[in-house]
Design a protein with these regions (language model features):
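Sec-dependent N-terminal signal peptides
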Residues: 10-18
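C-terminal/peripheral segments of proteins
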Residues: 26-554, 560-563, 567, 572-762
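Bacterial N-terminal signal peptides that target proteins for export
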Residues: 2-11
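N-terminal signal peptide c-region/cleavage motif recognized by signal peptidases
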Residues: 20-22
């Protein structure tokens, strides 16, 4: 039925269960009910009286906006892509369907899903059950959009939400080794899942891009630097614009218990990044290790047995079977035997982690034991102070692979590198790891049980570091982070002395972090304002240009030689470029991107090398007087000219003509150049570059006597359905650099010009 009043349209959709068929019908039993209020850009404000009702509203609203996205991800995490789409097709991450299915069938076994579910609190279970009911209700009432017609779109279960959550957990670990796990086979045995060299190249690229596609910037300002003596927070996570890591903006309220707004990942009925009445927080991908590899010494008599403390042990075998669609539409069962040691599954990466007659490699992922992640964000959503938020993270240790930065209404700022990290001390690394492997991948000796992770009885799970052993810093001026180690979250208070598995110090800072610290230092003469934080992102300064442009222009003036005529247009474009990545920035930006991409592969290209004593100002300059660098630069210039000509770009081309989302021009650019507003793109057939990851949910939160005052937007918009009016509206606002106030109070919500209301119950 539809109920209307003068202020809003209220739609009540309900199946009234429990009605007596007798003459004296009793009151209907309401299993779940919620109110969904929508404001500008369609942002849902979901209100309910209990957890089940709140979950019901979240699931219903999410289905309205992103049904096809979630349905696709459910197929993926259920290991059913081959069944519906064929084994040779690929996921959004360019992963072969069959390898993906074998991996997720291994990861999300019925036992693993049940164990995770049983570890949840009643409140979390009720929230998830409500979410499932709400999503299914919308699917039942409205069917599937044109975007995703097919048998693969189905009702979901609480188990599906668990599977989605477990996929999130292993993104920083074994999830990066899906192909290596799915195809691992003993020497001389043919794998059921064949992985080509190309697939491993893609996997390697995805692994290297993990921190780029899921990077972030964050600044938390304390009372000493804030314009009003209260805390301030800039949240600028860089996350994918498509797929299973695409944020969703929402506001959740249970009167008297919960009032929190922000963004959540698909399938999660909690806020991951956001704010409430007293606290605002965000996350940045950390540099801590969340898994280690173990090199197994194999039994010389049998390559499916390994030696541990001199004893021969068999590798455990598990057979995984996937249904694969054939060209004629029939299904064929494809089986693969997977192996594991007591340390974890065996992974095989040709040329990198080979399984031969002498050695094999197991991977132990700390987050496979993390069943606390939903409870963690549930607790953070309710935190009434910075101390309460910090205490919850110490107690639960549920943050998987990110740092946390937060500020509160009392004017404190906080940085915590408190994620799930294997307890491997510096001493154990020295004893058990091969120094030739370096620190990019930690490879421990699997032949000795003494090399197992240490156990601290104070931890939330066995084998990880205790919270008080991890980096954290509370300040009244500021903390910042841009995906570097914990070392210089605030240069006035360096965080040092940790195991390299946790955080390294006295290593080079990334250019975004250098930009952020120098920008914050430049503001020391006055209080930091909301506008200052907004400009950090929206100015689109190319930090690296300031470090090398004088040398580039000198090279143009003195070192072009016989190529002077061919390279003069490039040099002119560099000289006239504004050294920003705005929509109207000129062709010099394209050339600069090309040149730096090439030069960053050249050893000793810096004129002044990194100096640990001067981490904020080194390295800098280009060593154009060194012949190898000069030669490489000249070659890069010629290649860039050829590339620009091939794309049909001219001196009048602008960045907004090149970097786009659909037809919408997008500012920002590659994070490697120190562009705070980082964007990752892929080339399109028409010569443009399509944004696939980068600035996503953007929020700037301050506090006053009335509570939080927030502005922000979701750069890729709320809905992934191209037919939705909310598929591109915030993207256009982002293109125009227009952040909007985020309505938080009931009065602000109802005063919104786009206010609509929907009541649902079941």
């Amino acid at each position: 039925m539809i109920i209307s009043n003068g202020l809003s349209r209220v739609c009540v959709a309900g199946v009234l269960l429990g009605l007596s068929l007798g003459a004296s019908a009793r009151e209907p039993v309401t299993l779940a009910s919620a109110q969904i209020q929508r404001t500008g850009f369609g942002v849902p404000h979901i209100r309910a009286n209990d957890e089940r009702g709140l979950g019901y509203g979240i699931g219903y609203a999410y289905a309205q906006d992103n049904m096809c996205l979630l349905a696709n991800e459910v197929v993926t995490v259920s290991g059913e892509r081959s069944r519906f789409f064929g084994p040779e097709q690929a996921t959004l991450e360019e992963r072969n369907n069959l390898a993906s299915d074998v991996f997720f069938t291994w990861l999300n076994t019925p036992q693993a899903v049940a164990t995770f579910w049983n570890a949840q609190t009643p409140q979390i279970q009720q929230r998830v059950e409500g979410y499932v009911a709400g999503f299914n209700r919308y699917l039942k009432d409205h069917g599937t959009p044109a975007q995703c017609q097919g048998a693969w779109v189905r009702s979901i279960t609480p188990g599906d939400v668990v599977k989605l959550t477990r996929r999130l957990l292993v993104e920083g670990g074994v999830g990066q080794f899906a192909e290596a796990l799915a195809g691992a086979t003993p020497p001389g045995v043919t794998a059921g899942v064949q992985a080509s060299a190309r697939r491993f190249e893609v996997a390697a690229a995805n692994q290297q891009r993990f921190a780029l596609d899921r990077g972030s910037n964050a600044v938390a300002v304390g009372r000493d630097r804030s314009f009003n003596g209260r805390g301030m927070l800039l949240a600028n996570p860089h996350f994918p614009w498509v797929g299973g890591m695409r944020f969703y903006e929402m506001h959740l309220t249970i009167p008297g218990q919960l009032d929190v707004m922000g963004a959540a990942l698909p399938g999660l009925p909690v806020i991951n990044i956001g704010f409430n009445q007293h606290v605002a927080w965000t996350h940045t991908v950390d540099t801590s290790k969340h898994f280690t590899l173990y090199r197994l010494t194999l039994d010389p008599k049998d390559s499916t047995r390994y030696l541990l403390d001199g004893k021969s042990l068999p590798l455990d075998k598990t057979t995984v079977t996937v249904q694969a669609k054939q060209p004629d539409g029939s299904l064929k069962a494809v089986s693969q035997t997977l192996y594991s040691s007591q340390f974890g599954p065996v992974v095989q990466w040709p040329g990198k982690l080979d399984w031969d007659n002498h050695y094999a490699f197991s991977l132990r992922d700390a987050n496979l034991g993390n069943d606390r992640v939903l409870q963690q964000w549930y607790a953070m959503n309710r935190a009434a102070s910075l101390k309460e938020l910090q205490t919850s993270v110490h107690a639960l240790q549920g943050i998987p692979w990110v740092n946390t930065l937060a500020a509160d209404d009392q004017g404190q700022s906080l940085y915590m590198n408190l994620s799930v990290v294997p307890n491997v001390s510096q001493a154990k690394l020295a004893q058990c790891s091969d120094p030739r492997a370096g620190l990019q991948l930690i490879v421990l000796d699997g032949a000795h049980s003494a090399c197992a992770w240490d156990i601290d009885p104070r931890t939330a799970q066995a084998g990880i570091f205790a919270a008080d052993q991890l980096p954290q810093l509370e300040r009244s001026d500021y903390v910042q982070h841009s995906n570097d180690s914990a070392w210089l979250a605030n240069p006035k208070a360096p965080l040092t002395g940790f195991s390299p598995v946790i955080s390294q110090d006295h290593i080079g800072l990334g250019p975004r972090a250098r930009f952020a610290v120098q920008r914050l230092q430049s503001l020391e003469s006055k209080p930091i304002s909301v506008t200052d934080l907004q400009h950090m992102v929206m100015d689109n300064e190319v930090y690296l240009a300031g470090l090398v442009m004088p040398d580039l222009l000198t090279f143009c003036a003195k070192h072009l030689g016989a190529d002077a005529a061919a390279l003069q247009p490039l040099c002119t474009s560099l000289k006239t470029w504004d050294q920003r990545a705005n929509l109207d920035s000129g062709l010099g930006l394209v050339h600069f991107i090309n040149l730096m991409e090439h030069l960053q592969q050249i050893p000793d290209a810096w004129r002044v090398a990194f100096d640990p004593a001067q981490p904020l100002t080194t390295p800098r300059g280009l060593a154009i007087d060194r012949e190898p660098v000069a030669t490489a630069l000249r070659e890069a210039m010629l290649a860039s000219v050829a590339d620009v000509n091939k794309l049909g770009l001219t001196a009048n081309s602008r960045w907004g003509d090149i970097q786009v989302s659909g037809q919408t021009p997008i500012h920002g650019g590659p994070q490697a150049l120190g562009i705070y507003n980082a964007m990752q793109t892929v080339p399109r057939a028409d010569g443009k570059r399509e944004v696939v990851s980068g600035s996503s949910y953007l929020q700037i939160v301050t506090f006053d006597d009335n509570g939080p005052q927030a502005q922000g937007l979701l750069a890729f918009s709320l809905s992934s359905d191209p037919a939705s009016k909310h598929a591109k509206d915030q993207t256009q606002a982002f293109s125009e650099k227009k952040l909007s106030p985020l309505p938080f109070t009931d009065a602000q919500i109802k005063a919104d010009p786009q206010y609509q209301q929907l009541r649902i119950k079941e």
